[in-house]
């Protein structure tokens, strides 16, 4: 049995042409692989309140997938949830069709027959940890969340779920870049894979490799599925080049297999951009920084340029709106100061 695994489609109709390019890329993957079933691990939509065009495009994707697969499973991602209430309310429920084997996973669901656990996104990480703790031995987990040590697509938010909580092979959406960790005990060799998006979604992801996965397993036996990661070589992508490198990379930039967002970094020399040689969907022009890090002063004074003394602290405490007395607050301040 072959299962195609893909995640974080982020269907977006706000950029003209992008939604069609996304749908075309996703359907090309399914049509090329012809899997027995598909699993979409969340963030189908870019925005919590998808537009009619985005809803209809996902219906088109599912209708095409159903022609060649026996079942499709779709997890609720954070972008698919109406609010952050963890109540499971999502527009994805519109696509539930058990007669044609489309199952929407709003809350944690265990498939005992296929030995799988599906965990959608929850804002409360304790809910996710509790679900991971209940995973039966040798079951495969599919989820939409991160783990301690990996960051979101903006690179500014870590997650608090330790890898030690992952005791079974796990595939995750939510993280846009491909990465793999080891869960459970050191000698368990439990794979925890963040699959990443099948295409880039912003310039911060420029030049990243995008993947989907194909799992091949025996329905009757209990052996772990065989995993094959496949690189996507079409669809939306973001590229960033300094203007001096445009001419040398025209073949890459103009590759017709991609719907390309090109950012051109312009320096102080204001060299002309060869627009007539570019065949891309969008061009974004941005000025490069005037100074690099080496040109910025690294001055670090040895003495305090400003300090807060006892008088300032005392005046601040006396003005504080607190039921504690000034003497009591100052006593606490001195204890903290002595502790330092």
Q: Could you describe each region identified by the protein language model?
A:
Residues 8, 38, 43, 58, ...:
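Divalent metal-coordination and catalytic microenvironments
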Residues 58, 76, 80-163, 191, ...:
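Conserved catalytic scaffold of divalent metal-dependent phosphoesterases
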Residues 65-68, 132-136, 160-167, 185-188, ...:
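Short, conserved loop/helix-junction motifs that constitute active-site signature segments
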Residues 3-6, 39, 118, 140-144, ...:
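Structural motif
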Residues 216-340:
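Accessory, non-catalytic peripheral segments of nucleic-acid enzymes
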Residues 1-63, 67-68, 130-138, 339-340:
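N-terminal active-site segment of His-dependent metallophosphoesterases
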Residues 10-14, 46-49, 73-86, 123-126, ...:
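Active-site environment of divalent metal-dependent phosphoester hydrolases
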Residues 151-225, 230:
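Conserved beta-sheet core of the metallophosphoesterase superfamily
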């Amino acid at each position: 049995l072959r299962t195609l695994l893909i995640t974080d489609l982020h269907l977006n109709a706000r950029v003209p042409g992008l939604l069609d390019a996304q749908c075309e890329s996703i359907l090309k993957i399914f049509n090329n692989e012809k899997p027995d079933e598909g699993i979409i691990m969340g963030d189908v939509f870019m925005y919590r309140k998808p537009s009619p065009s985005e809803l209809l495009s996902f219906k088109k994707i599912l209708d095409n997938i159903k022609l060649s697969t026996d079942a499709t499973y779709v997890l609720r991602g954070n972008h698919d949830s109406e609010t952050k209430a963890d109540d499971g309310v999502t527009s994805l429920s519109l696509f539930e069709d058990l007669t044609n084997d489309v199952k929407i996973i709003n809350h944690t669901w265990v498939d005992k027959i296929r030995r799988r656990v599906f965990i959608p996104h929850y804002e409360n990480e304790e809910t996710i940890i509790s679900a991971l703790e209940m995973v039966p031995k040798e079951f495969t987990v599919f989820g939409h969340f991160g783990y301690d040590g990996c960051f979101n697509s903006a690179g500014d938010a870590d997650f608090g779920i330790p890898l030690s909580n992952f005791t079974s092979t796990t595939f995750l959406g939510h993280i846009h870049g491909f990465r793999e960790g080891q869960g459970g005990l050191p000698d368990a060799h439990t794979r925890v894979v963040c699959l990443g998006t099948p295409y880039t979604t912003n310039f911060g992801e420029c030049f990243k490799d995008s993947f989907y996965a194909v799992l091949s397993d025996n329905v009757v036996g209990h052996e772990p599925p065989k995993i094959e990661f496949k690189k996507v070589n079409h669809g939306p992508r973001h590229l960033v080049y300094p203007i001096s490198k445009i001419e040398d990379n025209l073949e890459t930039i103009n590759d017709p297999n991609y719907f390309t967002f090109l950012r051109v970094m312009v320096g102080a020399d204001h060299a002309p951009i060869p627009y007539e040689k570019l065949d891309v969907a969008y061009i974004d022009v941005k000025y490069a920084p005037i100074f690099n890090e080496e040109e910025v002063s690294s001055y670090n004074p040895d003495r305090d340029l400003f300090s807060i003394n006892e008088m300032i602290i005392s005046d601040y405490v006396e003005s504080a709106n607190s039921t504690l007395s000034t003497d009591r607050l100052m006593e606490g301040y001195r204890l903290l100061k002595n502790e330092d």
